[in-house]
Swiss-Prot record:
It comes from the Bacteria. SMART domains: BRCT, LIGANc. This is DNA ligase. GO terms for molecular function: DNA ligase (NAD+) activity; metal ion binding. SUPFAM superfamilies: BRCT domain (SSF52113), DNA ligase/mRNA capping enzyme, catalytic domain (SSF56091), Nucleic acid-binding proteins (SSF50249), RuvA domain 2-like (SSF47781).
Amino acid sequence: MTDTQAAAERIAQLRTELDTHNYRYYVLDEPSIPDAEYDRLFRELQALETEYPQLLTPDSPTQRVSGTPASAFGEVRHEIPMLSLGNAFEEQDLLDFDRRVREGLADLLPGGDLLGGGAEVEYSCEPKLDGLAVSLLYERGQLVRGATRGDGSTGEDITSNVRTIRNVPLKLHGEGWPEILEVRGEVFMSKAGFEALNAKAVETGGKTFANPRNAAAGSLRQLDSKITASRPLEFCAYGFGQVSGTLPDTQVGILEAFRGWGIPISRELRLVKGAQACRDYYDDIGRRRDALAYEIDGVVFKVNRIAFQRELGFRAREPRWAIAHKFPAREELTELLGVEFQVGRTGAVTPVARLKPVQVAGVTVSNATLHNMDEVARLGLRIGDTVVIRRAGDVIPQVMQVVLERRPADAQAIEVPEHCPVCGSAVERTQLVKRSKGKESISEGAIYRCVGRLSCQAQLKQAIIHFVSRRAMDIDGLGDKIVEQLVDRGLVASPADLYTLTYEQVFELEGFAELSTNNLLAAIADSRKPSLARFIFALGIPDVGEETAKLLARSLGSLERIGKALPEVLTYLPDVGAEVAYEIHNFFADEHNRQVIAQLRDAEHGVQLQEEGEVAAEFAACASLAGFIDKLNIPFIAATGAEKLASRFGSLDGIIRADWLDLRQVERLPERAAKSLRDFFDEPANVQRALAIEAQLREFGMHWQSERKAVEGLPLAGQTWVLTGTLEAMSRDVAKDKLEGLGAKVAGSVSAKTHCVVAGPGAGSKLAKANELGVKVLDEDGLLKLFDEHGVAR
C-alpha cells in the first residue's frame, strides 16, 4: 500500500469517526469521547489533508469554514414559500384553532358527531425557539445550500455560514433520505453560549448583544464565515420544504427520520391527541421554560398527518394546520419620563412613551408604543407615572397599566400638539367612522392627523420608503438613510421625483461614488415598468396590503377601473369589506393623490404599468341581482327576500318601479319588508345611488336579467362539483370562485348527485367515495384545461 493510499484510508476513518461523534454529541446528546480526544482526532485529520490536498473533499469536517469572506449575500427564491404561523395568545385561541381543524377535516375523521367531541386530532408539539428561520437543501445527502427565510418568498444565500454550525450535518447519515431534501428549522444560540459570547466581548472590549436571538441573527449574517464559526450557533429542524423522493406520512415520523439522518430535532418533541393534551403540553413547557437551555417564546402545534395538512391547506400567509401558542409576555415596572409624538406615512400623529430604561425579558426597554390618544385616555396615563411595561409576544414593548398608588403629586397630563412636531402644519382631530351593512356610525375613537401631506418631511420619507420597498417598486439600494438624504437635501418632494434624479445629484450624496451612483440610477430605471399590483401596493393606500393589491389588479385589470370603482362595487371582491372599499375609493377620489399618481405616470419621466387588461371573467360573473339587492342593506330585506324580488321582477328597474300592489304579490314577502323597500326607493338619492352602482357593474362586464336566467346561461349551471387534495396553480378557494363563476355549485362532500370531483395530491376519502359512486374525476391539469376552454383566467 502506498503512502497516499494509507493516508486516504486513515482520512476516511477519521471523517467517519468525527461525523459519528458529532452525531452522538449534537443529535443524541450522548457524547462518546472527551472533548480533548475529539480535538486530537480533528487536528490529525487537518494535518493529513494539508499533507495530501488532493484528498480534501467539501464534506470533510474540517471544511466548515470558507477561506474568503463574501462581498454580499446572494438571493435565494424559495420553491415553496416559508410561511409564518398564526398565533394563539389565549386558551380560547387554541380551542378555536382545534375546532377549525376538525371542521376542515369533517369527512376524514372518525367519530360521528364531530363537534360534539367524538373525534380528536393528533398534533405534534415542540417548543418555539427564539432564533432565525433557515432552509437547508440537501442533494443526494450532501448539504448544497443554506438560506434565510427572508420575506417568505425570497431569502439570502448563507451557505458558507450554515456550514460552520457544528450540529448541521454536511452529509446525511444512514440511508433512505430523498434525493432532494429541504430541511427547515431554527438557528439559535443557547443561554450558556450567549453568556459566554458576551463575557468574551466584555473582556476584549467588543460589542455585546442584547439577547440570544439578536446574537444568533447577527452571527448568521456575517459576510466572513470565520466570524460565524467563532459564535456558538446551533440548529434545530422543525419541518421540510421541497422534496424529491418519499418521506414518512406524519410530522413526527418525518422529524424522527431527520434525527436518524443526523439532523438535530427538538428533544421536547411530543405527539398528543386533542386540544386538552395540547394545553397540558403548553403548561408543562411553560413551567420548565426557565430551566431549558435556550430561549423560547411559546410552543408550536401541527396537525400530525401530512395528508390532513394538505387537506387543510393555507391562508394567504400561514398554514391552516399549524399554530404558535405564545407565552404571556414578560412584564416590568418603570417610570414614564415623557411622551413624544411621531408622524406616520398617512399623517397620523401618535404618542410614544419615553421610559426610564428597564430590562424586560433580556432587552433594555426605553420606549414603548401607546398606539393613540384613545389608549392614553383609557390608561389614564400621566407623565411621571409608574407603569407596567410588557413586551407583547416578547418583541414589541407596550404600556399596559398605571400603578395609581405610586402617582406623584406633580404628574402632568398628556396633550396632543396643535401643530405637527415635524413640519408645523395644523394637527386635526378626525372622528373615526364605522361602516357596517351599508350604514355609517360614529366610533368612540378619533385620530389626530397632520394636514401637511407630502410637504411634511416625516410623511414624505415614510411614503417614499414604502414606495421603494421590495414588495412595492423594489428599487434596490434605496434604503432609509438614502431616502432621508434625498428628502433633507430637497431633491425629492414626491415619489415621482425619484425618476428625475440626475447623476450629479446622486453622486453628491454621502457615501456615493461612481459605481454606486450608476447602480442606484439603474435600479430606479429598472422599476419604471412595474406590474399593476406592485404599483397599487406602492401607493400606500390605507388598509391595502400586498394581497389586496394583487386582488384589485387581477380582478379589475386597470388602474383606471380601480380608481373610479365605487365602494359598493369593490365589495364584490372577495375579502374586501366596506371599510377597505371606502379607503380605496376615498384614496383615489382625493385630488392630492390624483396629482401624485399623474406625476408618477408622466409619459416622459414616469412609470409604465404592465399587465393592464380586462376585467377578470370570474369577477364579471360573480354578481347576481339578488346579491345586489341584499348589498343595498334595505331594512327587513334579507337574502331570501332579495332572491324572491329578483325572481319576480328580473331587473333593478323593475324593482324600483314596483308599486305597493306589485310588491304584495311577491310570494311570502312580509308586509313590513314591502313597505321598507318602497320607502327606500321613494328617496331619490337611494335610486340614484343604486342605478349608479348597477351602471358601473354593467360597465365592468356584469349583467343580469333574472337570477334564473343568469345561472342558466352559464356552462356549468346545475352541476355540483367537489374539490379535494392540494392544488398547485391556485388555492382551492380561488378554484371554487372560478367554478362558481361558471355556474357550478361547489360542495364539501361527494354524493351520487355530484357531477365531478377535482382531486389534487393528498386527496383522501372524497376521492375514494367518488370512485365508489362512479363520479367523474379530474386532476388539476383537467381543471385548468376546463378553465381555458371557457376563457377563465388562471
